[in-house]
């Protein structure tokens, strides 16, 4: 059951950090530092305070935050050695139910990435499909260490925003989705076409499915 913003505003530092400690994977100091900005008028204000705490942390603290996140779709993940939040997120894309061949592909990428950068590949899986994650994985291996450190922190912020929206009830939640509009022109009449059914499909590496 979500915690309300009013409840969070009434908590002491220990309770506040305990309630929000999982928003930034096993890193409760982010919530502890955001605590000083209470009371929060909106969930968006709370998120901004937590992001500010992470962004202003020392370099070694940020690296520890990055390293607190699990690798994607490893045999360790298969054995359920994940936080509840990460398990749900990876499970939503079936990353805990891959074939042995797919697990081996992820493990090769995980090993190559960790060897190059010294920390796990991080992506907000709830904003991706399995194919887009693999594509992003391959492309980011070519980045510089500084670029990947910045990318990892940005993805952590996206993960935290979605987790916070799920975990806290209150006014002014940060935006977590967007809009897609489709315009079909009737070229004979020069007016928008009416009565057409539009279906969106994702086409990936050997897969295709309606969205």
Language-model regions: role of each:
Residues 16:
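Surface-exposed, charge/polar-rich loops and edge strands
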Residues 114-149:
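Long, amphipathic alpha-helical coupling/dimerization segments that relay conformational signals between
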Residues 1, 11-12:
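N- or domain-start disorder-to-order transition segments that initiate the globular core
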Residues 205-211:
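Short, acidic Ser/Thr/Gly-rich low-complexity loop/linker segments typical of extracellular
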Residues 5-10, 24, 29-109, 163:
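Aromatic-anchored, charged helix-turn/loop surface patch used as a conserved interaction hotspot
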Residues 166-194, 200-203:
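Beta-strand-rich domain onsets/edges
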Residues 151-174:
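Charged phosphate-binding loop/patch that engages nucleotide di/tri-phosphates or the phosphate backbone
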Residues 2-3, 72-75, 127-132, 145-156:
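Non-catalytic regulatory/linker segments of enzymes
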